[in-house]
């Protein structure tokens, strides 16, 4: 597997509000040689444009931020190597589809004297999720939704006395549901 990527973005300021549209280009070349099938050679190339837009605004001593971005993950070399794990499963090769997603996030971050904080909510719509497990072939599972909240804070005790440590705390809540899809398996 070989990959190259590049991006362009622009910051547009409207007073305290900043808008940042951007575009990322990903180029992937994947090859597979199956030596157990007479050195069968497969090749697949992809060029993908991934748009995104983010915003931020300084309000009341904090920063509100958010964005919507397109995500893309091609099948890994490891998934391609063991696609046909198990008997009686469909033949597969480089026809495994890439995962695509829309990633949305909104949150606030700031500083209150001895406390840095950040709270964000997120929602991710994933299409063609690549999934596997014991006795299961890597296949495109289907559509999956994930959403949750991330909270992070740093207590800056070193501001009180230089010998005191800063203490960081983080928490993430994640809820995921399979909206549409089936796992193909040999497990009875």
Language-model features and meaning:
Residues 45-60, 147, 166-175:
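Transmembrane beta-barrel strand/turn architecture of Gram-negative outer membrane proteins
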Residues 12-16, 57-61, 70, 110-114, ...:
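A generic beta-sheet turn/junction motif
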Residues 6-12, 53-57, 106-110, 149-155, ...:
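Residues on the lipid-exposed face of transmembrane beta-strands in outer-membrane beta-barrel proteins
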Residues 1, 9, 39-43, 92-96, ...:
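Outer-membrane beta-barrel proteins
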Residues 1-59, 74:
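Signature of Gram-negative outer-membrane beta-barrel scaffolds
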Residues 13-19, 28, 114-116, 121-126, ...:
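Gram-negative outer-membrane beta-barrel transporters
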């Amino acid at each position: 597997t070989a990959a190259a990527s590049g991006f362009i973005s622009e910051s547009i300021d409207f007073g305290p509000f900043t808008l940042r549209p951007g575009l990322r280009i990903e180029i992937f070349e994947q090859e597979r040689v199956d030596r157990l099938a007479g050195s069968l050679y497969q090749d697949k190339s992809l060029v993908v444009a991934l748009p995104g837009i983010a915003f931020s605004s300084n309000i009341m001593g904090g920063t509100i931020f958010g964005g919507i971005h397109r995500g893309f993950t091609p099948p890994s070399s490891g998934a391609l190597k063991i696609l046909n794990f198990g008997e009686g499963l469909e033949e597969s090769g480089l026809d495994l589809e890439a995962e695509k997603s829309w990633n949305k996030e909104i949150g606030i971050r700031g500083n209150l004297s001895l406390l840095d904080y950040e709270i964000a909510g997120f929602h991710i719509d994933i299409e063609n999720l690549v999934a596997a497990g014991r006795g299961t072939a890597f296949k495109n599972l289907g559509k999956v939704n994930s959403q949750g909240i991330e909270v992070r804070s740093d207590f800056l005790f070193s501001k009180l006395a230089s010998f005191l440590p800063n203490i960081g705390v983080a928490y993430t809540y994640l809820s995921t549901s399979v909206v549409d899809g089936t796992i193909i398996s040999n497990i009875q």
